[in-house]
Amino acid sequence: SPGQVAFTVEEAVAAAEELGAPVMVKAQVHTGGRGKAGGVKFAADIDAVREHATNILGLDINGHLVKRVWIEKASNIAEEYYASFTLDRSAKKHLGMLSKEGGVEIETVAEENPDAIAKIWVDPVVGLDEATTRAWVAAANLPEAAVEGAVDILQKLYTAYTDGDCELVEINPLILTPEGKVHV
C-alpha cells in the first residue's frame, strides 16, 4: 500500500492528512511481534493518528526502540495471508512459507497447525521461477482471483530477499481485498 515514513507525531499527522483517513500506523523496527506489542494500530481519523503515533513512537518492542512509524492507507480486508523467505541452513536452500493464517504469530501456526503453511525450498543457484511460484500459491489454496497478484508479489519478495542478502523477509499480512486484489 502507498504510504509514508514519519519520525514525529506531526509528520504522522501530515502523512495521514495527505493519504486520507482511515490509515494504519505501524512501528518500523527490526523485530517481530509488532502488532502484539501495540505497534500496529488502525486510525479512523486524524485524532486517532495523533494518539497512536504518540503511543508508538518511543515504544520498546522486544528491546527495539521505535523511532519511526509507517503511515499507510487502510485496506478493506477479505482475507489475510503470511508470506516469508528465510535460509534453511540444514537444506542449504531458501525456505519460502505461505499461509492463510496471516495476521498472527507464524511461530504459533507452525507449532499448532504445521499443515496450514505451504512451504517451498528454493535452490539459490536456480532461483524462484514463475511455475514454482504458481504451484506454491496453489498449495496455499489462495482464491483463483488472487493468483496473479500473489505470484507477482511473491517473486518480488524473493528478489528483495536475495538482492538484499537478507536473513528473513516477511509480509504479514499479505492482504486479499473483497475485490480479489492482493497487496501488502
Please describe what each predicted stretch is:
Residues 63-121:
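Hydrophobic alpha-helical hairpins/lids featuring a short glycine-rich hinge
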